[in-house]
């Protein structure tokens, strides 16, 4: 399990764009399960939508990408690198995410070849599928 302090040691993202609250499991150094607690105080609810707050789908995808980043950084060869979003395939949204929901984020690295990685990702709330996709990343060195 990784708390927010450990997550910040792995990911360069910070408020308001750090969208992973806790990592609850890491398997085989390539599969990560994490959570994002969605509260009524999220900045994006001010405009999306004031009378009908729904978490934007692109932010659900970003939370999944960040979870994938944590998975990629479990590989020693990737330490000091960042996974840049390079593409997405088969993305489907099945359920809205609203204040009070807890997103369960799952990412499994399915391919790692050179500087390119792919991850199969899935988000659920209380067992209901929210989103699934395959995300591609280009690994790059972090600036010093």
Curated annotation (Swiss-Prot):
One of its GO terms (molecular function) is (3R)-hydroxyacyl-[acyl-carrier-protein] dehydratase activity. Its EC number is 4.2.1.59. SUPFAM superfamilies: Thioesterase/thiol ester dehydrase-isomerase. It is found in: Cytoplasm. It comes from the Bacteria. Belongs to the thioester dehydratase family. FabZ subfamily. Involved in unsaturated fatty acids biosynthesis. Catalyzes the dehydration of short chain beta-hydroxyacyl-ACPs and long chain saturated and unsaturated beta-hydroxyacyl-ACPs. This is 3-hydroxyacyl-[acyl-carrier-protein] dehydratase FabZ. It comes from Listeria monocytogenes serotype 4a (strain HCC23).
């Amino acid at each position: 399990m990784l708390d927010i302090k450990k997550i910040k040691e792995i990911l360069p993202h910070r408020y308001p764009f750090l969208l992973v609250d806790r990592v609850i499991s890491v398997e085989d150094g390539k599969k990560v399960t994490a959570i994002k607690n969605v509260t009524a105080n999220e900045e994006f609810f001010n405009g999306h939508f004031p009378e009908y707050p729904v978490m934007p789908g692109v932010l659900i995808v970003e939370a999944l990408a960040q979870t994938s980043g944590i998975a990629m950084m479990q590989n020693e060869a990737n330490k000091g690198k960042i996974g840049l979003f390079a593409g997405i395939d088969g993305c489907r949204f099945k359920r809205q995410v609203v204040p009070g929901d807890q997103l369960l984020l799952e990412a499994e690295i399915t391919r790692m070849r050179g500087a390119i990685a792919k991850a199969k990702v899935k988000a659920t709330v209380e067992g209901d599928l929210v989103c699934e996709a395959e995300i591609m990343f280009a690994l790059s060195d972090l600036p010093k």
